[in-house]
Amino acid sequence: MLESLNFHFAFYDWLLVFMVTALGVFSAYTKDPQLKAVAATIPIPCGFAYIAVGLPMGAANAISGFMCLLYVHIVRILHYKVKIPIIPSIALGLAFFVTLGTLLMPIVPDTEAMFLGVCAFDFTVGVILFQKQKYKSGVRYKTPLPVYIKAPAIAGVVSGLMVIKHLMGGFCTSFPMMNSIVSYESRYSLGDQCRQLPLFLIAGPIMFIEMRYLETLLHLNHWIVLLCGYALFACIYWPLNQELKRRNERADASYSGEKK
């Protein structure tokens, strides 16, 4: 009965809980808001969810990457514009993701055309946002709580989010577990989290394509597929992240010059 309710965790589920908790603790004690945002977009949780789910990368993975972008903007708008407290804002963002993912899961065709089309859409949106969005550095902040309180709290939240993993199917790999933790830890600088997501939309689809065809055409082991995906993602993400930092610095310098 517990297994049917998704309360049964396999080994890879526990490994995913550990990895997301570790990244969550890192984001909680890191003052740099841009580093917090990086923690939300590196695909370590995504990769371990891929191992745990055991499904090839497909259209659902690419769609859920874009849904993560919608999630962070929903949280930002609800918290900053509508003035809803951060925890209800995160809950509403997650409810949107789960509802949309659950509705799309049975109707999204897992065809090559759909997969490649969504990847192209994600990449295009990522490039446009990266070029057009406004840049500035956010508020530096780290949690005042001691780690022996913060770490178990994060682990409890992550474990609760894992309960719905199997419900999401392929959408699970980009389910915003890490983004939800970082949204709370970055509640004073949600703009940084939003500015970081286009980098994932640029690098993620290329990683998804590589991983799909390494698995379906070459029939490589999931771990080898994942490591190859990580390597390609890092080659794309790292220079983009360096450019993002430079743009933030230039925007801050320009703003300081205007004030003088």
What are these regions (language model features)?
Residues 1-33, 37:
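N-terminal signal-anchor module of multipass membrane proteins
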Residues 5-17, 51-70, 112-122, 165-176:
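Structural signature of hydrophobic alpha-helical transmembrane segments
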Residues 21-31, 70-84, 127-137, 181-191, ...:
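C-terminal ends of transmembrane helices
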Residues 24-42, 52-54, 157-177, 185-187:
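A structural feature that tracks compact, well-ordered secondary-structure segments
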Residues 36-42, 83-95, 114-118, 139-149, ...:
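Cytoplasmic-side transmembrane-helix entry/capping segments in multi-pass membrane proteins
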Residues 55-116:
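Membrane-interface helix-loop-helix junctions at boundaries between adjacent transmembrane segments
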Residues 101-109, 154-167, 206-223:
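Hydrophobic alpha-helical transmembrane segments in multi-pass integral membrane proteins
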Residues 132-168:
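Selected transmembrane alpha-helices and immediately adjacent juxtamembrane segments
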